Amino acid sequence: MGWAEYSFRQPTIPGDQLTIRATEENTANSWSVEMINEEEVVCVVGKVGLGKADWSSEFVRSTSLTPTEEGQKKKSLTLETAEIGVDWAAKKADFTVEAATEFTSEKQRTNNPLFVGSNPIAHPSWTAGWAEQLMRHNYDIPSSMHTRSRIQHLNVVPVGTQVIGAAHVVGAYERKAHHFVNFDVLLQDQAGEDIAQLRHWTIFKIATLEERENVLG
């Protein structure tokens, strides 16, 4: 059991080399983390720790955990259609050796024996990726920009697990012409055991340069 929280301060692009600095904090079993690019710009800040995070009790649990099929007609997400306090449609996915291999060879490259081979468990980033997947399961989102997350990991995900994910909308707002949505995610296995809970912030409508200039002056 462990947790992570992080915020993206500056964009990173393919080819960037990031230095990761982890500093143990005074509190037990927690570390502050920074990811810094070659120009010494801090791009990501966060904390990680063991056990349960202080904020883990703040999550809103979804009650709509019956998954719906892909291919349903999706509407556009707007500030008006975000439906604060409503559960999104749930989705399911099987964690297989093939899924693990694809993820660790194409998205989060690693040769850590925990996450590769014939009997891997899911990489924590695979779990974190569920938030954006659930948003796109419910809405037609051409592009988005993930800005912040809190993740409470509760169980590992071994091969053969069927994962069911659901989300509950916490808020939607505009900031500097960008349109944000904030939602909580609950992941469970086929036996109804909790795998993880997430709180996710993302820009679902990225402002154009003209829109930002109009707001910022």
PLM feature spans:
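Long amphipathic N-terminal alpha/beta scaffold segment
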Residues: 145, 156-157
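Hot-dog-fold acyl-thioester-processing enzymes
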Residues: 1-2, 49-148, 207-217
